[in-house]
Amino acid sequence: MAKVKKICIAKNSGDKMEDVNQIEVIANKGIVNDRYFKDNNESDLQITLIESENIDYYNRISNSQMPYINFRRNVITREIELNNLVSKHFFIGEVKLLGIRLCDPCKYLQDMLKDKSLVKKLINRGGLRCEIISDGKISTNDIIKII
């Protein structure tokens, strides 16, 4: 069953990500207390997801033990293929989201994690950028359901 494994936010850009058990989200704005929260927010900046299995894959091929939180995505999932959710509506708990586009790994993340081949290793495995359609709360262990 697809679930939320971990939730992370950062209050300001560049801050270390903070592990939290629950977030409040507001449609078209983002995650309350997160660095990208603002009125009329761009749809692909509101919330990001990544599969725990892809982080595990990265750690395996890199012979590392990089914590999930270091990948700078808001919601770490398990047992769901996020790439299939582009242009699809789905729920995390009570919150309705729309998959906007893949969240490809970037040089910023590569530099933060000090791995010159991170972008190459995580192509098509970097997660999903989503628009928040309905207000609500997302918690660790919430069920993810495709509509």
Residue ranges and their predicted role:
Residues 1-147:
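Metal-cofactor-dependent catalytic cores
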